[in-house]
């Protein structure tokens, strides 16, 4: 369980448009890339393309790692579906607000159903803030 203090730091640091590194596995080798992500309640949310290499890698192995700004974590990734689907309306609204500076700049074609939301559900993490180390277990 994450402590209230660590959750506050996570929300301050990542509860907005944040760049994090997302690591997947490709043929037994790590593959890492930076992604825009938004943190909420123990998970990162990422808008991506369903046919990308990262999604192909996640289909083969859902175990991932992330890191950014004095934070590292392991978790599992899942395609939760088309960005504009009725099921994702609440999440899409949060992501639209978080990514407001760039979401409608033409990079995303939301008429294409391959524009999906990737959720990274965090398992364990290490967070550093103000000379304090937080070892976090996100399980309930």
Q: What residue ranges belong to the model's regions?
A:
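Extreme N-terminal tail/first-helix region
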Residues: 1-16
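Short low-complexity stretches enriched in small and charged residues
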Residues: 1-4, 23-36, 72-84
């Amino acid at each position: 369980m994450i402590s209230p203090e660590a959750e506050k730091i996570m929300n301050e640091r990542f509860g907005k448009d944040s760049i994090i590194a997302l690591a997947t596995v490709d043929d037994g080798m790590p593959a890492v890339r930076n992604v825009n992500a938004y943190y909420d309640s123990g998970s990162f949310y990422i808008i991506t393309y369903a046919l990308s290499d990262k999604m192909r890698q996640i289909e083969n192995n859902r175990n991932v790692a992330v890191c950014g700004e004095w934070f590292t974590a392991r978790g599992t990734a899942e395609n939760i579906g088309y960005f504009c689907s009725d099921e994702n309306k609440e999440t899409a609204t949060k992501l639209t607000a978080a990514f407001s500076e760039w979401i409608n700049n033409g990079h995303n074609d939301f008429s294409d159903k391959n524009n999906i939301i990737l959720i990274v559900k965090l398992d364990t993490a290490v967070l550093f803030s103000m000379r304090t180390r937080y070892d976090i277990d996100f399980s309930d």
